[in-house]
Amino acid sequence: LFHDTIINNVNLGDVSISNEKVEEALRDAGAWAFVESLPEGVDTVIGERGIRLSGGQRQRISIARAIVGDPELLILDEATTALDPQTEERILRTIGNLTKKGITAVAVSHQTAVLEIADQVFKLENGKFEAINN
């Protein structure tokens, strides 16, 4: 994350992305409640690497950034690791909804909750990659 406002961290300065689209992404990522509670809301400067936010809050902002542009492919590496169970569930539900819209999501995780939304599971062990039946 950059030493800038939340809105600029989500839209990466792309003025073609509306404030409404940023808010939708923040909601989908489970970040809207805490962003809305900040004195300056989306205009809050979060500090270098998001230092003024908790680890879970930083992750939720990063997920909002990833989904704000309606990607065709979403690659997530331990995306829910630092989140509480309720936020993790919401984000996994969001990822599941995105895949229903035709977005392919590849999630790398040690969290077993991710298995609930997976169409296909692969395991990497001892340098070998194998498909596991769901």
PLM features: what roles do these ranges have?
Residues 102-108:
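Conserved H-loop
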Residues 69, 101:
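Conserved signature/switch motifs of ABC ATPase nucleotide-binding domains
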Residues 116-123:
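Conserved catalytic segment of ABC-fold P-loop ATPases
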Residues 61, 67-68:
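Hydrophobic/aromatic position at a conserved helix-loop-beta junction
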Residues 74-77:
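Catalytic Walker B motif of ABC-type/P-loop ATPase nucleotide-binding domains
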Residues 85-87:
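Helix N-cap at the start of a conserved alpha-helix in ABC-type nucleotide-binding domains
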